[in-house]
């Protein structure tokens, strides 16, 4: 077995897609799932309006999905102490460039301890993302 993708429910597919493209993701597939199939898979009442965009970055696939027939409810932003998936972590070559891409594509830097090691950002719809310099490495002392 292997992981296929991680799905992220969004309100505005194209706005969020542009944000992740600014961080190096590329679109590999876009689809509209027929209501009957979506109803059977998701247990939602028709009409569903299931649209998805699959984005890829270095082998990782992120599915952005929306359901026009079932608007997303207003919810508090998830944080690191809530149960369940907390964030997506993206390795970056240059922290300053990545932070600039976040800001210019509608996101926000929400925590930055300095030093260029890692920071936390939110996408245009509030999803928490960790930017980490290159690959996982020991946390700096101090």
Stretches with model-predicted labels:
Residues 1-18, 23-33, 85-92, 135-142:
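N-terminal beta-strand motif that seeds the catalytic metal site of vicinal oxygen chelate
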Residues 9-59, 97:
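Core segments of cupin and vicinal oxygen chelate
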Residues 30-32, 62, 90, 96-142:
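Vicinal oxygen chelate
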Residues 36-39, 71-75, 110:
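A cross-kingdom feature marking solvent-exposed beta-strand/loop segments within repeated
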Residues 47-51, 84, 116-117:
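A short helix-loop-beta-strand connector motif used in the catalytic cores of GNAT acetyltransferases and
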Residues 64-66:
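Active-site-proximal beta-strand elements of phosphoester/diester hydrolases
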Residues 76, 81:
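Long, charged/polar, surface-exposed segments that mediate recognition or autoinhibition
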């Amino acid at each position: 077995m292997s992981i296929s993708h991680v799905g992220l429910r969004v309100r505005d597919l194209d706005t969020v897609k542009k944000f992740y493209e600014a961080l190096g993701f590329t679109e590999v597939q876009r689809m509209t799932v027929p209501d009957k199939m979506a109803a059977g898979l998701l247990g939602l009442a028709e009409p569903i309006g299931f649209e998805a965009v699959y984005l890829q970055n270095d082998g990782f696939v992120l599915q952005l999905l929306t359901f026009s027939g079932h608007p997303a409810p207003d919810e508090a932003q998830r944080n690191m102490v809530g149960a369940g998936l907390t964030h997506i972590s993206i390795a970056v070559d240059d922290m300053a460039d990545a932070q600039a891409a976040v800001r210019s594509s509608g996101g926000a830097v929400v925590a930055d301890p300095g030093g260029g090691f890692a920071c936390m950002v939110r996408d245009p719809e509030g999803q928490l993302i960790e930017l980490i310099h290159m690959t996982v490495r020991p946390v700096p002392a101090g």
